[in-house]
């Protein structure tokens, strides 16, 4: 089992974080193409690994267990749900075990002695 720190990416707003929690996912952006960095990052995680979510300007917002690799999806622009807040199209299932309800409740990186991750672009 490994631990991955992962930036939830833009926009850094409650609605985007709530969507990640509600859908039970972590997402990545980059170019939104097969084989890009987002694809690689989400495929490097093994089922049962922990993902520690971070939001720029706020801090750490959640921790969850990564689902099976079979839950990875690359959505086309047409498949994005109505109101999708981000440009991210790579998704992977996460069972959010610990999470703040609002970004204002985030734990700042300096409080845990870590730097902010830069993983989702």
PLM region spans:
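Short, well-ordered loop/turn sites that connect or cap secondary structure elements
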Residues: 45-46
């Amino acid at each position: 089992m490994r631990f991955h720190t992962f930036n939830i990416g833009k926009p850094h707003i409650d609605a985007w974080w709530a969507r990640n929690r509600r859908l039970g996912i972590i997402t990545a952006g980059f170019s939104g193409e097969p084989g890009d960095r987002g694809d690689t990052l989400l495929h490097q995680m093994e089922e049962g690994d922990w993902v520690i979510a971070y939001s720029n300007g706020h801090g750490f917002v959640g921790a969850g267990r990564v689902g099976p690799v079979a839950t990875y999806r690359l959505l086309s622009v047409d498949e994005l749900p109505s109101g999708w807040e981000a440009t991210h199209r790579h998704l992977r299932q996460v069972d959010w075990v610990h999470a703040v309800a609002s970004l204002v409740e985030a734990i700042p990186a300096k409080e845990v002695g870590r730097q902010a991750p830069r993983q989702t672009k």
